[in-house]
Design a protein with these regions (language model features):
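Non-heme di-metal
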Residues: 2-231
């Protein structure tokens, strides 16, 4: 099969999964709040931080989606690994869709460097998948290690700096909107860590050169997070 046909097939699978998995993801997502404290009760600093969270997480999940898309294309011939990557990819599609909606609902501008994230993420996924299965899994291990720590950091800030907000009745209470966001991040963090464990179980540490590959990818991911929060 030609490379062009493979890309078309990969795109069709991505679109199909994007429709099917969103429905299946509803059952494990925390319910969206119907009332309670909202953005109007946040200070300018809190509002700015919340926008950074949504912007960087949307960019990160976009990147994860396309990393797995690249790996899926490169390893589509591997019958053992293909369903494993597909499962993780489907979860990332749902993560991306969720943050796309949050970005739209709260009118948060996307990262200006979104085209770069798209090209870089797909290229990274395809390149490591083209190397071999172990390199692809080492890539997953490195990315999910950074993202797991990133989500934990966000949860600490949201728990410590967004408590006791004033609601519409001028009373102090926990923001249901913030609690919903925290619940969403917790679910996604746990799934990212599942991907990390899956990568280790599928021989990520047998990649060569393991240390150079994983540390390089971690550095790239950390830099991307830093930039996407701000630009």
């Amino acid at each position: 099969m030609r490379a062009g046909s493979n890309v078309k097939l990969c795109t069709k699978v991505l679109i199909r999964n994007q429709h099917t998995y969103q429905g299946s993801g509803v059952s494990y997502m925390p319910p969206k709040p119907e009332n309670g404290a909202t953005h109007s009760s946040l200070s300018p600093a809190q509002q700015a931080y919340l926008e950074r969270v949504i912007r960087v997480d949307q960019a990160g999940e976009l990147g994860a989606d396309l990393i797995y898309a690249g790996q899926y294309l490169a390893l589509s011939h591997n019958k053992k690994v293909k369903p494993i990557i597909k499962h993780m990819w489907e979860q990332e599609i749902h993560h991306r869709s969720t943050f796309n909606k949050l970005q739209s609902e709260h009118r948060v501008r996307p990262s200006i460097l979104t085209p770069l994230w798209k090209a870089g993420a797909f290229g990274l996924g395809f390149a490591t998948g083209f190397m071999n299965k172990e390199a692809a899994m080492a890539c997953t291990e490195a990315v999910e290690t950074v993202i797991g720590k990133h989500y934990n950091s966000q949860l600490r800030v949201l728990s410590n700096n967004f408590a006791d907000l004033k609601d519409s009745n001028d009373k102090f209470s926990n923001s249901k909107e913030i609690e919903h966001l925290k619940g969403t991040i917790k679910v996604f963090r746990d799934q990212e860590l599942e991907h990390l464990n899956t990568a280790i179980q599928n021989d990520s540490k047998n990649a060569r050169p393991y240390w150079l590959l994983t540390e390089t990818i971690k550095t790239v991911c950390k830099s991307a997070v830093f930039v996407a929060e701000r630009i």
